[in-house]
Amino acid sequence: MARYRCCRSKSRSRCRRRRRRCRRRRRRCCRRRRRRCCRRRRSYTIRCKKY
């Protein structure tokens, strides 16, 4: 199975589907690693990327 990590890519449609919301605030996590959350920033959102 593919693993995912957080990245700062804007155009990643694949990442959008595999993001999950974290319990803490509005942060979103990667499917495989729930501990690492993607934070929302001003101009972009950090998303999950395959590695």
From Swiss-Prot:
GO terms for biological process: chromosome condensation; nucleus organization; sperm DNA condensation; spermatid development. Its main location: nucleus. Phosphorylated by SRPK1. Pfam families: Protamine_P1. The keyword DNA-binding applies. It is found in: Nucleus; Chromosome. One of its GO terms (molecular function) is DNA binding. Keywords: Chromosome, Developmental protein, Differentiation, Disulfide bond, DNA condensation, DNA-binding, Nucleosome core, Nucleus, Phosphoprotein, Spermatogenesis. Disulfide bonds join 7-15, 38-48. Protamines substitute for histones in the chromatin of sperm during the haploid phase of spermatogenesis. They compact sperm DNA into a highly condensed, stable and inactive complex. Belongs to the protamine P1 family. This is Sperm protamine P1. The lineage of its organism: Eukaryota, Metazoa, Chordata, Craniata, Vertebrata. The gene is Prm1.
